[in-house]
Amino acid sequence: MSRKCDICGKGLVAGVQYSHSHRQSKRTWLPNIRKIKAVVDGTPKTIHVCTRCLRSGKVQRAV
């Protein structure tokens, strides 16, 4: 499954995680991506969308 939003382009983010003793380990944070049927250019199409774009109404779902 895609790890990138087709609407806003949000993807995974790399960084460093710190424990209580301040030891470091590299890790990635994944966006909350959903596969939905949406209307794109007047036709229903399956796209990958983050939940923030879904909630903000940037996507019109296909019925």
Curated annotation (Swiss-Prot):
Keywords: Ribonucleoprotein, Ribosomal protein. GO terms for cellular component: ribonucleoprotein complex; ribosome. One of its GO terms (biological process) is translation. NCBIfam families: L28 (TIGR00009). Belongs to the bacterial ribosomal protein bL28 family. This is Large ribosomal subunit protein bL28. Pfam families: Ribosomal_L28 (PF00830). It comes from Clostridium acetobutylicum (strain ATCC 824 / DSM 792 / JCM 1419 / IAM 19013 / LMG 5710 / NBRC 13948 / NRRL B-527 / VKM B-1787 / 2291 / W). One of its GO terms (molecular function) is structural constituent of ribosome.
